[in-house]
Amino acid sequence: VLIRVLANLLLLQLSYAQESSELVIGGDECDINEHPFLVALHTARSKRFHCAGTLLNKEWVLTAARCDRKNIRIKFGVHNKNVQNEDEEMRVPKEKHFCVSSKTYTRWDKDIMLIRLKRPVNDGTHIAPLSLPSNPPSVGSVCRIMGWGSITTTKVTYPDVPHCANIKLFDYSVCRDAYKGLPEKSRTLCAGILEGGIDSCKVDNGGPLICNGQFQGIGSWEGHPCAQPLKPALYTNVFEYTDWIEGIIARNTTVTCPP
C-alpha cells in the first residue's frame, strides 16, 4: 500500500511539471492512476454526480458541507462513469460531521464535511487514501484540481472521466478584490489562473486542491460563469481544520471546530 501511495504522489508531481495551459474547465482527462483518493458523490435517486470528495483512510471521506444531501451514495475507484473498474466500490455514510451544522457554512467559512463510512472500503489499484497536510500551503504554489465538473463555461458539459488541471495559489486578498462581501480574514484559499480559462466548475465542489503533493484545499465556491479572468475560486483551507478532523477520527468528543 505504501509503495502505491508513493507512486501516486510521484504521478502528481509529474503532473505539476506539465504546462498549465490545459483546459476541469481548461483541463485534460486525468490519468486513470492519478486519482485513487478521488471519490464521487450522488444520491440514491440520481446517478448523476453532484460533488467530489477525498478518501482520508478506509473509513473516512472529506468533502464540502455544501455537498450534503439525503441518501448520499459515495463511489470509490471511479474513472469513466460508464465503465466500471474491477475494484470500484460504493458506500453510504454512517456519520456526518460539520462545524456546528450542515447549514452554517458560507463561501468563506466552515464549508467542510467529514463523513464516516458505514463500512470501510478495500484497498485497490484505483482506491488509496490521501493524507492530511503536514504543513500550511505557500502562496505561489502550483496546485492540481480534478473532478467530473463541467468542462465548458456557458453551456454545462459534464465529462465521462474526471479532468485535471494546474492552477496557482494566490494570496487571499486577490479573491477579496475579485468578490464583494468577503471578510478581511478567512479560512479559505484563493486559487486559479488570473488570465482565466482554467478553473474548477459545477460538480467539482468537494474535490481536492493538491499543492506540491499535499492535500491543501476542498473545492468550495467559484465565480459564475466559471474560469473568468481575475476571478479565482475559493477552497476550504484543510490545514486550518486538521486538529478538528484528526480529533473526530480519533473519537475525541471534546474537539471543536475552529471559531
UniProtKB/Swiss-Prot annotation:
Q: Which biological processes are named by the entry's GO terms?
A: proteolysis
Database matches in SMART domains:
Tryp_SPc
Domain annotation Peptidase S1: ranges: 24-250
Q: List, alphabetically, the InterPro entries matched.
A: Peptidase_S1_PA, Peptidase_S1_PA_chymotrypsin, Peptidase_S1A, Trypsin_dom
Residue pairs linked by disulfide bridges in the UniProt entry: C30-C164, C51-C67, C99-C257, C143-C211, C175-C190, C201-C226
UniProt keyword Disulfide bond, yes or no: yes
Q: Which GO terms describe its cellular component?
A: extracellular region; secretory granule
Expression tissues: Expressed by the venom gland.
Q: Which UniProt keywords apply?
A: Disulfide bond, Glycoprotein, Hemostasis impairing toxin, Secreted, Serine protease homolog, Signal, Toxin
Family, according to the entry, reads as follows: Belongs to the peptidase S1 family. Snake venom subfamily.
Q: What is this protein called?
A: Snake venom serine protease homolog rhinocerase 2
| Native source species | Bitis rhinoceros
